[in-house]
Structures are given as C-alpha cells and as structure tokens.
Amino acid sequence: MSLPHSDELRGQKIIISGGGIGGAAGALALALRGADVTLYERAAEFKEVGAGLQIGPHGWRMLESWGLLDQIVVAGYLPEDMQFRDAVNRETILTMRFDEEFQQHYGGRYLVIHRSDLLNILVTNAEAAGAKLHNGVLVTDSRTVDGGIEVDIESSINKGEDNKTLLVDAFLAFDGIHSVMRKKLVDDAPVASSYVAYRGTSKLAEDAEMKDLKSVIGYIGPHVHFIQYPLRGGELLNQVAVFESQRYLDGRTAGDIPEDWGNPEELDRAYNHCDPFIQDRLDTLWRNNWWQMSDREPLENWRIGRMLLLGDAAHAPLQYLASGAVMAMEDAEAVALFAADAARAGNLDWEEVLAEVEAERRPRCSRIQTVGRFWGELWHVEGTARLIRNEVFRQADRNGWFIYADWLWGYDASKRAHIANPELGEMPQALKEWRYALLEQK
C-alpha cells in the first residue's frame, strides 16, 4: 500500500529528538505532509524496551490514516476479546468483546503488537516518506529566535564531539520519561509507583496450557496483576507480571529506598495469594530484568516558543490504560494535522500551531495520566473492596461497557473529534463513584 503523501508543509524544517514510537510517528506524520524532518536519537540503534503493547481503536484509526494497517496487522495480532479475571481464583469478571459491534462503534479494531515491530514499521515508513533519521546524536538545548529555533546537538557516543547548532522552523521533543528538554520547563523527576514489572515471551505453540489463547487476559488481584496475550500472529505468548514492592514501601518509610527494589525474591512472594496457575507462570518470565514502574506528574505547560514537549517527555503515564504509545502517536498526528491545516489556510505560525496542539492535547493526556493511576488502584484492591470491584465489573459486563471506554477510545486525533459520546470528556461519573466506594473499604 502506498503512503498518503501531501505537500502542505513543503519547505518547513523540523527537528525531532527521540527515536522511540512517538518520535518515529512524528517523523512519519510530518513527512507525509511534505515537511523536511530530521530525527535525532541518542542511542546507537532504534530499539524499544519491553515486549508487547496494546493499540486500541484510537490508535488503529491513526495507523489507518498513515497507510500502515496492512503492515501492522501482519506484524501484530487481533485478539477476540479482553478478559478481566480475579487473580485469586481465576474467575472471569468482565469480558470486553472486540466483535463487529465494537468495530462499528469505534471505527477501528483492537490490536496487540511487539514494541520492536511497531517501531521498525514506523522507522521504515518515516524514512520512505523522506524523513532523515540519525542515531548516536543527543539534542542538548534549544532557543527560539527571530524566524525559527536554534537546536544544539552533539555526539552521544563521543561526548563533546560533533557539536552543531541548527536553525529550523520547529523542534519537537519526544525524548522520553527522562527527558532532557523537560528540564527547560520544570525541575522534577519521574514518580515511582512502588510497582515493578517482569516480562517474558515464549513460543505459544509449545505451551500446552496456552496454545489456544486468542484473548488479552488480565488477572487482577491484591497488589498484583498478570497479563497474557499472543503476539506476531499467534507465534509468541507475551506475559507480564506486575506487583507492589514491599522493599520499596519499607525503604520509603525509612527514607532509604534500595536500588534493587522489586527483585526476583519479591516476585515469588508477591503472588503467594494468587491461583497456582499464575504462580507456576512466574518461572517463564525474564527474571534477570525488571522494570520499576514510574510516571510523570501532569504538566501545566509543555511549550517554550517553537519547542514542544510530547510523548512521555510531556505526559508519561502508568501502563494501566495501555495507551502510552497511542498517546504519543496522537501527539504526532496532532502536530502534523494542525500545521498542515494552518499552511493550507495560508497562516502557518509555528508558535501558534504548537500552542494550539498543546491546548488540544494537554487536557486529554493529563486525564489519561490521572485515570491511569486510579485504574491501577482499582485493579489492586483487597478485602471487601476486591469483592465490590468484582461485582462492579460483572455489572459492566451485563449492562454494556462502552460508556466506560468511550472517553478514551472514542477520540480521533486525525479528525480533531470524538466519534463516540463526546460528552464523556471527564472520567465517567460512575468511575468516580466506584473509586470513592472502593477506597472507603480499604
């Protein structure tokens, strides 16, 4: 399938820092509108940390608008549904079916894909669209000046070498949760959640218990959860174990948090109260590597002149809504769309465009960050709160769950509009009521 090129941004020079999913998506979306895009990634190669990620219909529609669906579907997997199960007894408490009704309601499908496969597709197509991508280069600073923005770069491999200052029209900082550019706006640090993740992939066909898996399954329980779904057309089984580290909590209380909180010894202890099926799965994970889960506080301002923070640099979320990658892709499409619209109208002013993008994106992304934290609380409650949570999920299963997902999945970054229940811009009232009721039971 050929990519959908246009030329509204021809002659516009843009620098992107960060070669993850958001940065590569930004390079692609802007190059497809004719912009002269250069991306700098500090690492020696384009590489994503982790294994699988989930793309809801809000991401599907963007990939479709970029002409990538054929490649994405071949590389990924289309699950039949998402099942929430109680981690203590494996009871299914909610099934979200990705059937024809779902597809018609949201105008898209639900897909899971290996992070490296998605990044490779974005990088390959960004270069095919004309973007220039470079590894081993760090963007160190920027300054808005008359007629543009100066961007300082240097070698990230041989520090202090190959220093240059480039003058371009706009600078987009997709430089991740440990963003260099964020420091120009606020002196803060990532917020540790006290939770840690272990991941692993294996051959699905060789797993007798899981070889017929066609779903995304999330086991949720007191202070833990465990995720399973197929990848690469059903070739791989992706599994993720996430639990709250007692060593982190004890260290925080004592004022001395150990660097290795969440180690494998804690992993085994954390699931003692879970169904034996889950406990037996822990040995299949990559036990030599674990990820301490952090997010960022929502920012009040993402922009300085012609520089805009985007992706995890601006709004790193926790993983519970499975929307971090899609949020970054939404950012990318918003910049390209708003700039192309302004250019088509003959009034392209990059400071105004980036301010408009921020005004559109910041409330939504802050909401996803905030609701993501609550969603994690809801997954991990214990005691009476767990029983209430389970009944709430059962009721959603019986009464229809679209109303709880429309605010997230109904957003279409390629059309500046929600396609389903646009009035649900805030966290639905029912979710707020659940939160208060559940947390009172702790």
From Swiss-Prot:
<comment type="function">
    <text>Catalyzes the NADH-dependent conversion of 3-hydroxybenzoate to gentisate (2,5-dihydroxybenzoate). Is involved in the utilization of 3-hydroxybenzoate as a sole source of carbon and energy for C.glutamicum growth. Displays a high preference for NADH over NADPH as cosubstrate. Is not active with 4-hydroxybenzoate, salicylate, protocatechuate or benzoate as substrates.</text>
</comment>
<dbReference type="InterPro" id="IPR002938">
    <property type="entry name" value="FAD-bd"/>
</dbReference>
<dbReference type="GO" id="GO:0018669">
    <property type="term" value="F:3-hydroxybenzoate 6-monooxygenase activity"/>
</dbReference>
<dbReference type="GO" id="GO:0050660">
    <property type="term" value="F:flavin adenine dinucleotide binding"/>
</dbReference>
<keyword id="KW-0274">FAD</keyword>
<comment type="similarity">
    <text>Belongs to the 3-hydroxybenzoate 6-hydroxylase family.</text>
</comment>
<keyword id="KW-0560">Oxidoreductase</keyword>
<dbReference type="Pfam" id="PF01494">
    <property type="entry name" value="FAD_binding_3"/>
</dbReference>
<dbReference type="GO" id="GO:0071949">
    <property type="term" value="F:FAD binding"/>
</dbReference>
<keyword id="KW-0058">Aromatic hydrocarbons catabolism</keyword>
<keyword id="KW-0520">NAD</keyword>
<dbReference type="GO" id="GO:0009056">
    <property type="term" value="P:catabolic process"/>
</dbReference>
<protein>
    <recommendedName>
        <fullName>3-hydroxybenzoate 6-hydroxylase</fullName>
        <ecNumber>1.14.13.24</ecNumber>
    </recommendedName>
</protein>
<keyword id="KW-0285">Flavoprotein</keyword>
<comment type="subunit">
    <text>Homotrimer.</text>
</comment>
<dbReference type="InterPro" id="IPR036188">
    <property type="entry name" value="FAD/NAD-bd_sf"/>
</dbReference>
<keyword id="KW-0503">Monooxygenase</keyword>
<dbReference type="InterPro" id="IPR050493">
    <property type="entry name" value="FAD-dep_Monooxygenase_BioMet"/>
</dbReference>
